[in-house]
Amino acid sequence: MSRKFLLVGNSHLACVKVAMDIEPGLLGGRTVDYVAFNQIDAADFDVVEGIIKPPTNTSAIPADARLGEARATDYSGFVIVGMGLSINLLASIYLSHRLLAHHRQGLHLLSRAAFDSAVAESIQKLGVNSIIAKLRAATNVPVLLVPEPLMNAEIAKDERGADVWTGEHTPFLVERYISSLHQVFDPVVDLLEQPPETIDGVFTRAEYAYGGLRSLTKRDKRGNPWRYKEDHRDYRHMNEQYGAIICRRIENWLTSRGL
C-alpha cells in the first residue's frame, strides 16, 4: 500500500495546509491530499463503490482541495480536522442553562445528567460522525480526529462573550468537552488533544490566533495567504504557527502507527 494520506476538514484545515505550503517537510515529507468543505455539508460526504465523493457544493471546496477519482483504499490513513468539534458546543448550552453550582438569575437550571446528555447529543449530531462511518465502511486504516482549538484567549476581554468565557464554570466546560470527545470517539478513531504548549489556562494562547487563517486558497494583493488582522473578532481560527505544531503532532501519530 502506498504511503499517501488524506486530510479532510473545514476552515480549520487552512492553518495546517498553509503551514505545509511554507514548510513542505512537515509530516516527514509524506504525500498528502486535501479535501475541504463546510461542516454543514459533511453529511453529503460519501464513499460510493470505494470512490470518495466529497459534497457537490463546489463553491465550498477550494480548487486545490478537490479530489479526482480517489479511492478510499488509496490512502494509508485519514486525518479529519475541525468539522464542528468545538468547545462552542458546550458554551451554547451555557448561554441559557447552567448547573446548580454555576447558576445565576435569568438562566435555566440544568441537572448534570441533562447537561451530559445534551453535550453527547450535540457531538453525535455532527456530520463528522457520518464521515467517519463512511470511511470505516470502506477501509480499516487508521483515522485521526483533530478537533478545533480552544477559543483565542482574547475572547475573555470581549464583553460579548464575558458571561460564558469568564468565571469558575469555564474550566469545567473545558474538562467536560475533552472528556466527552474521548467518550464518543475513542471507540472508533484516534483523537489528538490540543498540544499543551498552545494553551493558556482554558484558552488557546493569543499568539497563535494573530493573523488567523480560514481559507485554503484565498490570497491577499501580494499573493500571501489571506488572514484576519490582529484586532478581528474571530476567536476560533489559528495561524500557520499553530498549524505547524499540529502537523508535527500528526507526524508523531503517523510514526506511532507505523505509517
In which residue ranges do the predicted regions lie?
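Alpha-helical cap/lid subdomain in secreted, periplasmic
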Residues: 71-208, 222-224
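Histidine-centered active-site loop/cap adjacent to the catalytic His
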Residues: 212-259
